């Protein structure tokens, strides 16, 4: 699973989904993502999980891509966005039996591109995010009586 940040600060999830939909019609370039997480925590699916999204270069055919909206040039996600991102990533990890510590990566980890910017520039924050996803999975499993 690859986490990205959108290249246009302050835009909505709906605007980014529309951008991808327009590219599919114009064939101007190949760019898409499976999901976009918005500034208010909304999660929009753009591409079915059974199809390839063009977002992660050489990793496109075996990853799920998530674009994340952010309010400004720092690239830091706000609280509502982070809550939904954690929820989505935890659900995807549970669905596909993935380990957040190994299987959740940044676009940077595939290509070296500074994306998602805040989590490339703040490695500790990235590690904390993955730990938070693991904790959410454990909480979900405890609530449902499952064990890993």
Predicted regions and their residues:
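Basic/polar, cationic surfaces and motifs that engage anionic cell-wall
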Residues: 71-148
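Active-site-adjacent loop/helix surface patches within enzyme catalytic domains
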Residues: 1-98
């Amino acid at each position: 699973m690859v986490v990205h940040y959108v290249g246009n600060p302050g835009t909505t999830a709906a605007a980014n989904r529309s951008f991808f939909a327009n590219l599919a019609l114009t064939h101007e370039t190949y760019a898409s993502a499976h999901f976009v997480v918005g500034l208010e925590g909304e999660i929009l699916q753009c591409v079915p999980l059974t199809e390839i999204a063009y977002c992660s270069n050489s990793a496109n055919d075996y990853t799920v891509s998530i674009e994340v909206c952010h309010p400004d040039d720092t690239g830091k996600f706000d609280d509502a966005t982070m809550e939904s991102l954690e929820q989505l990533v935890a659900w995807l990890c549970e669905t596909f039996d993935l380990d957040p510590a190994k299987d959740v990566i940044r676009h940077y980890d595939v290509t070296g591109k500074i994306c998602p910017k805040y989590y490339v520039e703040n490695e500790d924050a990235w590690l904390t995010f993955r730990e938070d996803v693991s904790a959410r999975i454990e909480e979900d499993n405890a609530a449902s009586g499952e064990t890993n």
